[in-house]
């Protein structure tokens, strides 16, 4: 059964004026190393009471996209307008209605309990108050000056009938000049770069900060979230004395250090303005000095790289195989695509960023099972991406998984996945900005703490949506998709005093 919404009645939950307060018992385990080899490990159950406070006043949200005129930016903007205006359009198959399919927050459900033996589900977004995506105000930057209506046509993602209905909404949307450094992206992007911020790197950062303030004032929004959906950059060199600490990073900015990428400059500007910044590409935007700066300023950062198609499947399948006691020994992943992302990734230095992002997705699953894998052992894992213009945004992903099974047997799984690249990425961008905003309205404290505090500024709450999740120093990296979703859902359940969904169903046993 499906219900549109619910209210929690519990002595541990209080719905107040503009906030929800909850008391939550966090049950976990503490592992103690043996004092000597002959004594075994000890596991101790541990309970800590946390108090959550969630502001329920939903702000008017502005979203600024870096690379607003690209395929992802135009597709998301067009999709939100189509939903807001209730647009429908005809194709040769049928008449379609605007929707938010592919969005975790808007189109998925959570189990809230059972009634007369039937499980009850509610919208994910009903857990706590969230921004309505139809109310988002969009803006952003792009190194191309093309308006969003023409950029939408250039992208070749949306059906023509839909484009015609959206054109008059998007013709007046023109990106602000963007930060451009040809050393960090493929040379083939130079022909687009007619809309760039001039000056030194420090001057560029100041301009981005000014752009954010002016956008917020002009659009009359309460909060702004900035997200990078521009070209994949090459990896930046992390060098002692340059970007390894906050002080060195800021000194390098003053010195106009060449090895500071555009994405890092945007991130610095956002942290300085106290605006959440999310990196949707695989490069190492968040160099150590930038992470230190974000922590000091308590400004939200998250990423890296949208987890939308092939990698999402991989994070499910390998988790299943290893969890079933099957040993993946070889993973071969091949992609070809024809959009501008594929064109940019045809350069070796930018492809390397994507290769690193995609390769690490199975690491935590492999390291979880020392029965299958010896120390240091890892599946052979190769990733290939090729640019084929004709297929456009319709990316093809082909994977072969070879595994060892019972008594020396072999198992091979082959997948062919046609990923409509931007149509998969756009709702993920939507979820990222909505959850980043929501995270700024949640505070918590443990039972031995006097004051509430916000989540750590390195936003692990966004891990489900990221190929290479950014985590605070010393925090385990989790890539398995089911674990990531459970973490996100259970944190929001805690905000309203609900127990985590453990699927034990003891009442029926």
UniProtKB/Swiss-Prot annotation:
<dbReference type="Pfam" id="PF01658">
    <property type="entry name" value="Inos-1-P_synth"/>
</dbReference>
<dbReference type="InterPro" id="IPR002587">
    <property type="entry name" value="Myo-inos-1-P_Synthase"/>
</dbReference>
<keyword id="KW-0520">NAD</keyword>
<comment type="pathway">
    <text>Polyol metabolism; myo-inositol biosynthesis; myo-inositol from D-glucose 6-phosphate: step 1/2.</text>
</comment>
<dbReference type="GO" id="GO:0004512">
    <property type="term" value="F:inositol-3-phosphate synthase activity"/>
</dbReference>
<dbReference type="GO" id="GO:0005737">
    <property type="term" value="C:cytoplasm"/>
</dbReference>
<dbReference type="GO" id="GO:0006021">
    <property type="term" value="P:inositol biosynthetic process"/>
</dbReference>
<protein>
    <recommendedName>
        <fullName>Inositol-3-phosphate synthase 1</fullName>
        <ecNumber>5.5.1.4</ecNumber>
    </recommendedName>
</protein>
<keyword id="KW-0444">Lipid biosynthesis</keyword>
<comment type="similarity">
    <text>Belongs to the myo-inositol 1-phosphate synthase family.</text>
</comment>
<keyword id="KW-0398">Inositol biosynthesis</keyword>
<keyword id="KW-1208">Phospholipid metabolism</keyword>
<keyword id="KW-0963">Cytoplasm</keyword>
<dbReference type="GO" id="GO:0008654">
    <property type="term" value="P:phospholipid biosynthetic process"/>
</dbReference>
<dbReference type="InterPro" id="IPR013021">
    <property type="entry name" value="Myo-inos-1-P_Synthase_GAPDH"/>
</dbReference>
<dbReference type="InterPro" id="IPR036291">
    <property type="entry name" value="NAD(P)-bd_dom_sf"/>
</dbReference>
<keyword id="KW-0594">Phospholipid biosynthesis</keyword>
<dbReference type="Pfam" id="PF07994">
    <property type="entry name" value="NAD_binding_5"/>
</dbReference>
<keyword id="KW-0413">Isomerase</keyword>
<keyword id="KW-0443">Lipid metabolism</keyword>
<comment type="function">
    <text>Key enzyme in myo-inositol biosynthesis pathway that catalyzes the conversion of glucose 6-phosphate to 1-myo-inositol 1-phosphate in a NAD-dependent manner. Is a key enzyme in the phytic acid biosynthesis pathway in seeds.</text>
</comment>
